[in-house]
Amino acid sequence: MNFAVLPPEVNSARIFAGAGLGPMLAAASAWDGLAEELHAAAGSFASVTTGLTGDAWHGPASLAMTRAASPYVGWLNTAAGQAAQAAGQARLAASAFEATLAATVSPAMVAANRTRLASLVAANLLGQNAPAIAAAEAEYEQIWAQDVAAMFGYHSAASAVATQLAPIQEGLQQQLQNVLAQLASGNLGSGNVGVGNIGNDNIGNANIGFGNRGDANIGIGNIGDRNLGIGNTGNWNIGIGITGNGQIGFGKPANPDVLVVGNGGPGVTALVMGGTDSLLPLPNIPLLEYAARFITPVHPGYTATFLETPSQFFPFTGLNSLTYDVSVAQGVTNLHTAIMAQLAAGNEVVVFGTSQSATIATFEMRYLQSLPAHLRPGLDELSFTLTGNPNRPDGGILTRFGFSIPQLGFTLSGATPADAYPTVDYAFQYDGVNDFPKYPLNVFATANAIAGILFLHSGLIALPPDLASGVVQPVSSPDVLTTYILLPSQDLPLLVPLRAIPLLGNPLADLIQPDLRVLVELGYDRTAHQDVPSPFGLFPDVDWAEVAADLQQGAVQGVNDALSGLGLPPPWQPALPRLF
């Protein structure tokens, strides 16, 4: 499923530049020919055998030969039928390819969109082309979604074709050898290893049932010795799911990857994914508890479970790690499979994604949007909670800058859909991954955002989220399904190294922070609609008189804060409120 993170330039080019229908139709024709030859061979073999036994060859030897030959005639007929089925499946694959080709956007249309975007960006000196750039990006996202939907459809159709192909029948001689081996070891059934087993796939001795591991177990999936029941682990247990020894009843093995919140739902499951390089050794309770702080305000009761994703980004997570694109693609596969499994079980699903897994959630939203309405989950069945989202429409670093690094396997992924499913998107102020400045020429804002990535996003400074102080940010329409919340940062990440200096570090940082915050905030537009993708601009519209007044107020506040930090009374009472 790598195509889920590949841009339309790649997906469209691949489907249009491929070999086409020819090889698949040729394969279908070849399988048809093989089926005809096998049918003819079976008929000829049966005819010769019948002729011999019906004319000159009679007696016990003739009867024995007839009995020996009959299974081979059946094998030839079965193989002929399987070859004919393979021919039909090849034609189905060709039809699926033809439908995919028709549904995929042509490379010429993709190139036209990219050319138009490049022209708009080049001429966007004063930001006047921002609406047109956003429209071009929106069109590009639609093209991306259409290509991904076509490729997912092709993947599903091709997978269905492949799974319907039956393996070639095992030879009669091998079947006979398997039966003789089972009888010689005193086993009755198939796949047993040991002596005296009755059933299938038992490993040990004197087991009765299926999939037991040990000795003298009766039941299904028991591990240990002399258990009676299903799924017991230990010895001498009678019941279901017991862990221990000599117990009777029902048990539930402890699951270190599950956290029950509130009343546990019921029927509400939270799938919790970590960020880049967060594939921690189990258990993952700290991650589940962290996610619970953000999920619980909307869902007071649910059962949270850790969903494993690769969480890798070559070369930052190691020279042997997966590239970002491959890691995200595998994560999308894991997430989609888990969502469908929970929905099939009748559960409502909440997806929690942070950092890289927020990008995984973005791709899953897009894929679900591309499906017909009757095939995708309802708005009351699925919701998302995101933090540290690099695809946030206004502020996400992957949305601010439309760049890809093919050498590192890193492809632009665009903005998270705002109208796919009910979503709460939390952004930490000054974390450059989800709150990157709109005007990066502001060196104070950009340096502070980079420091935010280093100190806040990486977790080097563990700050508990203060959800009560979160600011709900504006959106373009009340019908938008996503709620955007900004969690304020009391201190600027850029001043973290200064605060590390003993004794004088904090007072000096407190002295300059209010004025520095004024300069940093000039790099942001806090009034922008958060659901509208916002690429970077060059120069903000600034009221310099207001900036001068804010700097004057900040200077007073800085002196008050510095003296307060030293335990001295401030010269101006009362202290002015902090700037946001």
UniProtKB/Swiss-Prot annotation:
SUPFAM superfamilies referenced in this protein's UniProt entry, alphabetically: PE/PPE dimer-like
Domain PE-PPE: 300-525
GO biological process: response to host immune response
Domain of life, source organism: Bacteria
Signal peptide (residue range): none
Family that this chain belongs to: Belongs to the mycobacterial PPE family.
Protein's name in the database: Uncharacterized PPE family protein PPE42
Protein's organism: Mycobacterium tuberculosis (strain CDC 1551 / Oshkosh)
Taxonomic classification: Bacteria, Bacillati, Actinomycetota, Actinomycetes, Mycobacteriales
